[in-house]
Amino acid sequence: MAAASPSTSDAAERLARLVQRLRRLVRGELILAGGHARLQPQDETDVATALELARELAVPVRFGGVSGGLHAVLAGHADSSRGGLPGLQIDASSHLTRAARFEGTRGMIEVQPGVRLADLNRLLQPHGWWLPIETHPESGATLGGLVGLDAVAAAPAWGTLADRLLGIDAILDDGTRQLFGPFGERSSVSLNSGRAGQLVSSLFGIAAGVQADIARHWPPGQRVPDGYLLDAFHPRPQRPYTPDGSVNLAHLLAGSAGTLAWSARLHLRLLRRPAVSRWALFLQPSAAAALTHAPAVLALQPSAALLLDAADLRRLLGSRHPDDQALCRLAGIGPDMSGRPDGTQQGEAGPAAWLVRFSGEADADVQAAHRRLTALLDPRRQESTTGLALQTGGGLQSHGRAAAGDVQPVWQVLLGERVSPTSPPSACIIPLLPQDPATLAGLISALDERLASQGVQPSWRGQVAAGELQLVVPEGAGPKARQALAATLPPRWTPALREAFVEVRRQFDPTGILLGGLMTARH
């Protein structure tokens, strides 16, 4: 067996000292496994103590047990050289699971980071509210993890979790506690330490230095998984995070994937649950052909607009659940994936499909939206053009609930997978950073052509409304696909913005101990 490197040996010794001290100082459980330690804190004091000692001993820290398997691109260029060193994982999912201060009249609630999304929405359902994030039914995603990702809703009007944040009670890398919330003359938020005051002053300075870059180059209405939400300091009319366009410092923590601070308590603004939702499926000859309709589809303001690939369609066709069977019948799709609109032929890239939902308070309005969508995507379709009313728990409202046992409808699984992907990036599944939906058709056509010239047959899937697609290629074609992406996609950030992201990270975590959540990193 090879001897451990000096750096690894030193890190293991520092971790052992940390664990020894934590056992005397915290109430939560400490678990040692695989050369790492995991703390399941009983309260926020445990977290503050652990962070303060980890910084003192230079032990890397990850925030785990909060993402429900959801992957993220880590922001701020965390130090990958520390990634393999023995470290501490802080896991909120066991004990920090309380929801409090629910205001049913105004739709506001305070939660700890370990609260599961499914549990929260189950609690809110009788009151007519929900947090409009939809994940895989079995993901177990928690609020801390979803805020760390700035998880996106299926409908553009519902925004991302940053749009739902009123404030975050945060714990910084040295154990300092600070409420990140509205900032300004009308705000009641006070900076309760010298560290917090210096940090906030530095952040405003960083944002001021890139104000022109934000105005010219910031992608409106999209997540920023490869940076930090510096546009929170310079709200724009087309995408304000707050109703009055003021600065809320909590938005900077959204999407930071655990690289800036621990989110101890989340103050959330909820959304009224829509009274009616209807779904429809439309077969298209290819992803590129489907995406030519993206601007027109999104102009109809759907509450979900998903692009499915041939593998997704096979899953729907193979399902025994009545919801899935009804969707395929409505689209006129047979086992051979026949049923393409007149005048189209199956492209070499294989068929694709739109899976679209409209939601609202009046069923007549929702049905009218589906009729307009049908006229756009499949004018041949004469009957059942008003969509299917599918319940979240499965079963068809419009056709009566058929016995399906405990089988999960595939459409519901696809909704979670496409809106909040649970499969980490791999050699064959490559997530694109968010793009302007209006440009997707041209981008996908260019990439398809480039990949086809190299003998690679791609497929595409994802959430079109958010501009977030996954490129799926055959095994072994991943390197070619990544090269094609690098050659085709334009630079996302200016040098000044990239440097600003690094400086934000340094101001929050000058010693570089916060390595983010237990998610796949991209550096």
Predicted regions and their residues:
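Glycine-rich N-terminal segment of FAD-binding domains in flavoprotein oxidoreductases
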Residues: 30-103, 108-113, 129-133, 454, ...
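C-terminal substrate-recognition/cap domain of FAD-linked oxidoreductases
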Residues: 246, 250-491, 495, 521-523
